[in-house]
């Protein structure tokens, strides 16, 4: 076991999809100059209203997923960053539905929507999914067009709740708008819609997946909704508050006296727990490899 959170359902989905072919025929790969030009042209050709777009082209062989320093490089891809429906909220703060969409040169005809988590407020790196472990290639590396959204606000606190529209955006509207805009931009870039579309998320992202399955069931061909955080106003919130209080009690402080919650448990603490889990659960999946994959054991 590695002392970090993974999402087995998402990993299973991506593993299955990696074994599936894309659309009929091999993925089309354009030369770098043509791909960069097509990336730039997205802005003028998108046709999206009330939307500001910026694009940047990442040549093949120049970047790995996320901040990884080893492993396979990503294919050439276009990163589209957008802000939809910009406005000033009732609290005087600026709001917009932000999203990041990565469009690979070797597109396999498939689209993956990465769910968020917590209060959202940040754009997930679409070159890297939290489900990647044990050498699993990133979705972008497999040829997926991949999108994430900040859910209509910036910052991970819940202060956006003071604005009624921001609450609606976080509940469902931003995810709807992002899905529709993403498919439109995919059509702009490749000249056709995705052959298959998928959503993958856990906790807050799991709630988003459940929301899609109820409100917009035609958007995706498959949804993984891991540990959906649905009744957050009930006991789950009280439990989270209690956990935060306890973490504050043991976490070290920075130079300004603020608690560093990410260091509430030291590396030796995490390794102690990981070793205990490995000793009990690792072999249950048939392979001793520091990965406890048989969650039902």
Predicted regions, residues:
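Glycine-rich His-Gly loop
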Residues: 86, 116-119, 228
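Gly/Ala-rich beta-loop-alpha elbow adjacent to hydrolase catalytic centers
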Residues: 200-205, 209
